[in-house]
Amino acid sequence: MATMHDKITLQLPAKPEYVSLGRLSLSGIASRAGFSYEAIEDLKIAVSEAITNSVKHAFKGEEDGEITVEYLIYEDKLEVRVSDNGTSFDLETRKQEIGPYDVGEDAEMMRIGGLGLFLIETLMDDVKLYYDEGVSVVMTKYINEKQVEENAKSIST
């Protein structure tokens, strides 16, 4: 198991104007951790989607909501937890309501709803959802995933 080096916590009001603050802080943290430009862009999109989902769905425009964003930096990965204490939902029920997405489907013809979680799952290496008091989305991205694959190929037995 990888050792955690640092944990950074950010408390955001559940308002659209603060989504960019989560994205900007992530960019600096991921850059310092050694992620490539492409991986940082993927991380920024995924975290923006997770925070936006909390703003739009957990609090439904209420002024007093708060979102917690935790960045856990390990030697080989970055784990980002976006948590709220707003209205929860059941992912499996939601997936059944909207049906599966076809990656070959024309983007203009895609139905609205559920695309944020689809994007998060596509861009991140691992995604877990927890339903306690609200929803927590835990997203993991490994550092130098291509390098890890190359090293595995070069190991001889």
UniProtKB/Swiss-Prot annotation:
Entry EC number(s): 2.7.11.1
Molecular function per GO: ATP binding; protein serine kinase activity; protein serine/threonine kinase activity; sigma factor antagonist activity
GO BP: negative regulation of DNA-templated transcription
Pfam families linked to this entry: HATPase_c_2
Catalysed transformations (reactions): L-seryl-[protein] + ATP = O-phospho-L-seryl-[protein] + ADP + H(+); L-threonyl-[protein] + ATP = O-phospho-L-threonyl-[protein] + ADP + H(+)
Keywords (A to Z) from UniProt: ATP-binding, Kinase, Nucleotide-binding, Serine/threonine-protein kinase, Transferase
Family: Belongs to the anti-sigma-factor family.
Function: Negative regulator of sigma-B activity. Phosphorylates and inactivates its specific antagonist protein, RsbV. Upon phosphorylation of RsbV, RsbW is released and binds to sigma-B, thereby blocking its ability to form an RNA polymerase holoenzyme (E-sigma-B).
PANTHER family per record: ANTI-SIGMA-F FACTOR RSBW-RELATED, SERINE-PROTEIN KINASE RSBW
Protein name as catalogued: Serine-protein kinase RsbW
